[in-house]
């Protein structure tokens, strides 16, 4: 990923008492999975360009019901993800090196 990148921590709380809410939850998770790495059930670490961040935020805003759902996006200092400490079972880190097939 060339150029400027940002590290984002995304957390969300989507109301799931209705089938529509459960659908929104799956949609939010699927969107986040397309951009980053799930580190907890409703928490993702994403490294992207500022332009990609705009696309991500637009997709998430479209997916939720703002009257019932909440998404928080924290922009972190670059390199913050590398300093994370885990207690308990930690998720596997994302593959960051180029793949040779």
Question: Locations of the language-model features?
Answer:
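Aromatic/basic micro-patches that form nucleic-acid/chromatin recognition or nuclease catalytic surfaces
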Residues: 40-69, 73-76
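Short acidic, gly/pro-rich beta-turn/loop elements at beta-sheet edges
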Residues: 20, 54-56, 83
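C-terminal structural segments of small proteins and small subunits
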Residues: 63-100
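Extended, hydrophobic alpha-helical segments
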Residues: 1-39, 43, 47-52
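Intrinsically disordered, low-complexity boundary segments flanking structured domains
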Residues: 30-33, 57-62, 85-88
């Amino acid at each position: 990923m060339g150029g400027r990148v940002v590290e984002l921590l995304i957390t969300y709380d989507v109301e799931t008492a209705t089938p529509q809410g459960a659908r929104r939850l799956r949609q939010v998770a699927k969107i986040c999975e397309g951009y980053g790495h799930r580190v907890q059930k409703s928490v993702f670490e994403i490294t992207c360009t500022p332009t990609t961040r705009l696309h991500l935020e637009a997709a998430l805003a479209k997916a939720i019901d703002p009257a019932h759902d909440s998404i928080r996006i924290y922009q972190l200092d670059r390199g913050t993800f590398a300093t994370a400490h885990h207690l308990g079972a930690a998720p596997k880190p994302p593959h960051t090196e180029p793949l040779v097939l």
